[in-house]
Amino acid sequence: ALSSAASDVYKRQALDPITDESNYEYEREGQKVFTTAYFREQRELLSAEQFESEFQQQPFEAKGLLFNKDELNYFFELPPDREPDTIIAVGDTAESGSDSTSMPVAVIYGTEVYIVDVVFDDAPAEVTKPECAKCLIFNKVASATFEANNAGQYYARDVADIIRQQGYSIGIRTKRTISNKQTRIEFASDNIKKNFYFKHPTTYKRGSQYWNFMKELTTYTRSGKVPHDDAPDSLALLENEIRMLSGGKIEIFKRPC
């Protein structure tokens, strides 16, 4: 059996997820090996899934991907000749230390849903609450809904307070979810793949919150056997919210000028 120290080394990722530098560089016969440049080159040569599995200790089930990146819609810019019907956001707050607070922001044109921004951060609530408030103000969001899990009620109230203190008014409410998370994600997946548009990968930086959000979304499997599902779950909550608003009700939530 591996000792705990050996086990930690065995699980260590080739590139540090924060610094993007090699965790394994050393000198062999006067030559540096397993350098940052080497691992970054491998990352360019392999698919994201292969690299994550082989070098970053993140195995996945390729055949069971629910949101395969090749099946999603992407955009470079919003439609220039149309005014959106509304701009909304849905927040899924972290329930445990390793979870991420996930809040996608959607600009809606008819049935088309453009995910223009996200808060996706595993930092504590005192960090993510101001992040959410700033994101909602910046994107001129008309209304935001937070899942009323253990702390969601208080979280939403605090975000609303921060926004009010900065002189803005955004409709914020909480909503309790009773459906099974995995079922909810599966049910929403068809509409997400058909009508949701995500920022093209060339338009944001590797390691950004949007990048981490998309990475978690596109490696989620149908079996649900993944370390985290905050990104797909927040999108499923958003899809559900949009369905509730549709049918002539969207104009009620026109964004503030």
Annotate each language-model stretch with its function:
Residues 49, 53, 57-58, 97, ...:
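C-terminal nuclease/phosphodiesterase catalytic domains that cleave nucleic-acid phosphodiester bonds
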Residues 14-16:
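Conserved AAA+ ATPase "SRH/arginine-finger" region at the nucleotide-binding site
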Residues 73, 80-81, 105-146:
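Nucleic-acid-processing active sites and adjacent nucleic-acid-binding tracks
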Residues 1-10:
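Single conserved hydrophobic/aromatic residue that forms the stacking wall/gate
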